[in-house]
Amino acid sequence: MILGASILQLPAIRKAKEMGLQVITVDMDENAIGFKEEGIICEVISTIDSEKILEAAKKHNIDGIMTLASDMPMRSVAIVAKEMGLVGITEQTALNATNKAEMRQCLKESGVPIPQFFRVSSKEEYEEAIDYFKTSKLKCIVKPADNSGSRGVDLLSDLSDEELISRAYEYSKSYSRGGDIVVEEYMEGPEVSVETLSVDGECHIIQITDKLTTGAPYFVEMGHSEPSAQPEDIKVRISEVASAAVKAIGIENGPSHTEIKVT
């Protein structure tokens, strides 16, 4: 069962068919491009409706469940895997992997290097976080706790501009599904992403990629270059940090995508 049937999930749908597997796809859009593939079973269900997805999974007696290129269905994947005794991640791990506040707390507790951060649920907490960075004379970045693709991200490089500070809060909050945002120290340096595959708790590095973004203040991804041009000793350290991060949030089986700033 593959959660999501958009163009982003299409390669997985086709690969699974190629392997001779019976593919069940789930998407709330009855016109999703993945539903047009021949020989697949289509279930028109929201990928975050874990209860209905579980019903469909039991109906089809599935042997595996996955998603890709989408954060939101991870909780559904975890719930179905647990209920049906399939290989997968736990619901807590799904939360750790898709909520920046939860993730940073896990990384901090495990000693993985991360910037100073604050989980913010209200305007008062936001003002307290901003006061910390004003006192420390550090740039900070504001982002929704539970979104992706650089949505709602804003850099605050001038903490004397109260209008900019207020606007960043409203902008980031508007992209937060649960209402929480993260305010964290802005780290200077090139950004890389690390693709890994974990098997029985062992994290294997697949590729390190240099990321190309628009830069401040929104950091929208524009492209990628692989393999990374970083020096070998830096790539070794990147691999160590990525592996530690994957283990810290609880991923024991499956692929992971980790983003790291080299400082």
Residue spans for each PLM region:
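ATP-binding N-terminal substructure of ATP-dependent carboxylate-amine bond-forming enzymes
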Residues: 1-93, 124
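Hydrophobic residues in well-ordered beta-strands that form the structural core
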Residues: 25, 88-90, 116, 141-142, ...
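Short hydrophobic patches on amphipathic alpha-helices
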Residues: 57, 130-133, 246
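Phosphate-binding core of ATP-grasp and ATP-grasp-like enzymes
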Residues: 171-180, 185-228, 236-263
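Active-site nucleotide/adenylate-binding loops and adjacent lid/helix of ATP-dependent enzymes
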Residues: 99-181, 188, 200, 228-240
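Conserved residues at the C-terminal ends of beta-strands
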Residues: 68, 120, 209
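Short catalytic-loop micro-motif centered on adjacent basic/acidic residues
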Residues: 2, 64-67, 115-118, 155, ...
